[in-house]
Amino acid sequence: MEPCELQNELVSAEGRNRKAVLCQRCGSRVLQPGTALFSRRQLFLPSMRKKPDLADGSNPDGDLLQEHWLVNDMFTFENVGFTKDVGNIKFLVCADCEIGPIGWHCLDDKNSFYVALERVSHE
C-alpha cells in the first residue's frame, strides 16, 4: 500500500488507526478503532506460525517490517497473547488462533507494543 493511500485509508489526521485491527487468519479483533498510533520503526519479526513453534526462537526466517501500530498499554488490546520471553522480546500473537507473531514487545520498554500492519487486516 502506498504511503498516501495508507494515510488516507488507515491513519486518521491524529495519527491513530481509523479501522479495527483484525487477525488475518481468523478475523478476531485485536484493536478497536482509534486505540493505536501509527509508527515507523524497523523491527524484525519471525515468519508467521503457531505460538508453540514461535517461542523456541530457533527459526531465524522472517521479515524486516517498518509500519506498525504502537500501543502504550497492554490492556488496550482486545484479543492478543504473548509468547514466552525470547531474549528480552515477547512476540504478540492472536489470542484466538495463536498465529503470530503479529507484533513485538521489548521487555526493556514496558509501554511500547508494536503490531505490524503487514501482519493484520483492517475493517
From Swiss-Prot:
Q: Does the keyword field hold tRNA processing?
A: no
Modified-residue entries (N-acetylmethionine), positions: 1
Detail which positions bind Zn(2+): 23, 26, 94, 97
Q: Which GO terms describe its molecular function?
A: guanyl-nucleotide exchange factor activity; zinc ion binding
Q: Which domain of life is it from?
A: Eukaryota
In this entry, which stretches build a coiled coil?
A: none
Q: Name one GO biological process term.
A: protein transport
Keyword list (alphabetical) reads: Acetylation, Guanine-nucleotide releasing factor, Metal-binding, Protein transport, Transport, Zinc
InterPro entries, per this entry? Mss4, Mss4-like_sf, Mss4/transl-control_tumour
Pfam family example for this protein?
Mss4
Q: Which SUPFAM superfamilies match?
A: Mss4-like
Where is the MSS4 domain positioned along the sequence? 9-123
What's this protein's function? Guanine-nucleotide-releasing protein that acts on members of the SEC4/YPT1/RAB subfamily. Stimulates GDP release from both YPT1, RAB3A and RAB10, but is less active on these proteins than on the SEC4 protein. Might play a general role in vesicular transport.
Family that this chain belongs to: Belongs to the DSS4/MSS4 family.
Assembly information from the UniProt record = Interacts with RAB8A.
What is the name of this protein?
Guanine nucleotide exchange factor MSS4
Organism in which the protein naturally occurs: Mus musculus (Mouse)
Gene giving rise to this polypeptide? Rabif
